[in-house]
Amino acid sequence: MLEQLTSLGLTEREGEVLSWVARGKGNYEIGVILGAKPRTICKHVEHILSKLNVENRTAAAAIAFARCSQLLDLF
């Protein structure tokens, strides 16, 4: 799954963050899951949005779902 997300030009960590964003998690929750501070997660999200050329988390999540069908199995 991460390989499909990193093929979008994201780092492995950004791919992890995007997978959690696509599952509907907020920065605080993602930080707890990944052992990072919410501000760090916020910066990762900013980089993700910039690299994907989208304006919000919802658009980034839509790209993640379109690129990685395994995310659908998580619901």
Placement of each model-derived feature along the sequence:
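Hydrophobic residues on short alpha-helical segments
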Residues: L18-A22, L49, A61
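Basic, Lys/Arg-enriched C-terminal extension of HTH/homeodomain DNA-binding domains
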Residues: Q4, S50-F75
